Amino acid sequence: MKYQVVIGLEVHTQLTTNTKIFCGCSTRFGAEPNSQTCPVCLGLPGALPVLNRQVVEYAIRAGLATNCSITQRNVFARKNYFYPDLPKGYQISQFDLPICQHGHLDIDLEGERKRIGITRIHMEEDAGKLVHADIPGVDDSCVDLNRACTPLLEIVSEPDMRSPDEAIAYLKKLHQIVMYLGICDGNLEEGSFRCDANVSLMPVGSNVFGTRAELKNINSFKFIKQAIEYEIERQAEILDDGGKVIQETRLFDPNTGTTRSMRGKEEAHDYRYFPDPDLVPVIISDDWIERVRGELPELPEAKRARFMSELSLPEYDAEVLAASRELAQYFEDTFALFPQAKTVSNWVMGEVTRALNDDNNRSIAECPVTPALLADLLKLMEKGTISGKIAKTVFDEMYKTGKAPEKIVEEKGLVQVSDTGAIEAMIDEVLEKNAGQVAEYRGGKETLFGFFVGQVMRASKGKANPGVVNEMLLKKLQG
């Protein structure tokens, strides 16, 4: 490609506070339209905002986790524009004094590490939502102000990404971090984590950025990548034809995989920012910052490294387990009761994840098999009470019923047979019924050994101890 792609991202994360940023209304998703509003949300004359302290705390968390410096004197500003879902005629945000600045995240892609700068993180309120009626013959749009005044952090990256894959790697890492911090539920479909992408092209070798287009409010990683890829092609075609890219805001259409013009792109001065006279500056002390720093959870990258260094887990296992804070906690809780890291990892990534996926993609928090129950099952397998194959059957029953593994094994008579006399009798019966195959095996066709093992296990209904079966069967066939 003769053009260098330049991408910067603006990510809006909706915070998991119970109430809004400047009033006491609920932030619960899915309520009846306009049922979670008050004079502040509605922008009524004389209504005064009161800052939610937890929003500031969450912003400090986000800043520390993304290597930002924390601004100790914070000022809120009014961002002035007119839109039907913005009843006040302005949005309360931050302008020249954002709460977090000069951070970075490191991404890993194809074995290489790259640092993506974070320009700023600032606190702001969300706007309402326009609902377009899907009724034949009705062209009206409705306004739902439940979302108005909901707390957001806007996380603005430097234009450091040079491909759609780098953008997605950065987004996924940021998504993982805000969920680990517990400040955002990360739900892209509900708009809790949404992204605007600024995309431009410049000639290879140049250090002067091209004219950018902003792609608005894209709510899935797949669509973000598609939107950026399309925009790169669109701009390259314009430049190849000798045209000029217009600075504008564009909307992505997931049905066609294309973007379309929405409006001309505004500059900061178009919003006529000025300090909000109804909100005093917020002073963040060193003690407050250090307290929040001390309460930060172990973040994904550190957890992944610890799983590999202290528990000797393979990189793949560590990556999968550390991807979700809840999954990692489930693994660690099980490991605390059954300290065999690789065995626990195999079961969590295998049977546990499979069962949850098959059950309408339930979350690990909803898993009916608790870490304690899973540890009990693994102990039965370790003691030789049940085989690995039977353990999977027992797990499925545990998932369905929530019963303890010991009870299921007892009720269904699944105790593993290790009695050498009983196993020898089964082996003798199998060899007698398959005399022809025995002759072939002894004639050099040793691949038949697995066939004999399978026949013995079938005769025992899966209860025979595989280790004992293998050892005794080998002696019989060699003798």
UniProtKB/Swiss-Prot annotation:
UniProt keyword Transmembrane helix, yes or no: no
SMART domains: GatB_Yqey
Biological process according to GO: glutaminyl-tRNAGln biosynthesis via transamidation; translation
One Pfam family from the record: GatB_Yqey
InterPro entries, sorted: Asn/Gln-tRNA_amidoTrfase_suB/E, Asn/Gln-tRNA_Trfase_suB/E_cat, Asn/Gln_amidotransferase, Asn/Gln_tRNA_amidoTrase-B-like, GatB, GatB_C_1, GatB_Yqey_C_2, Gln-tRNA_amidoTrfase_suB_CS
Alphabetical keyword list: ATP-binding, Ligase, Nucleotide-binding, Protein biosynthesis
Gene3D superfamilies: 1.10.10.410, GatB domain, N-terminal subdomain
GO molecular function, one term: ATP binding
Primary enzyme class: ligase
EC number: 6.3.5.-
Reaction(s) the record says it catalyses: L-glutamyl-tRNA(Gln) + L-glutamine + ATP + H2O = L-glutaminyl-tRNA(Gln) + L-glutamate + ADP + phosphate + H(+); L-aspartyl-tRNA(Asn) + L-glutamine + ATP + H2O = L-asparaginyl-tRNA(Asn) + L-glutamate + ADP + phosphate + 2 H(+)
Bridged cysteine pairs (disulfide): none
PANTHER family the record matches: GLUTAMYL-TRNA GLN AMIDOTRANSFERASE SUBUNIT B MITOCHONDRIAL AND PROKARYOTIC PET112-RELATED, GLUTAMYL-TRNA(GLN) AMIDOTRANSFERASE SUBUNIT B, MITOCHONDRIAL
Subunit structure: Heterotrimer of A, B and C subunits.
Function: Allows the formation of correctly charged Asn-tRNA(Asn) or Gln-tRNA(Gln) through the transamidation of misacylated Asp-tRNA(Asn) or Glu-tRNA(Gln) in organisms which lack either or both of asparaginyl-tRNA or glutaminyl-tRNA synthetases. The reaction takes place in the presence of glutamine and ATP through an activated phospho-Asp-tRNA(Asn) or phospho-Glu-tRNA(Gln).
Family membership noted in the UniProt record: Belongs to the GatB/GatE family. GatB subfamily.
Protein name per its UniProtKB record: Aspartyl/glutamyl-tRNA(Asn/Gln) amidotransferase subunit B
Gene: gatB
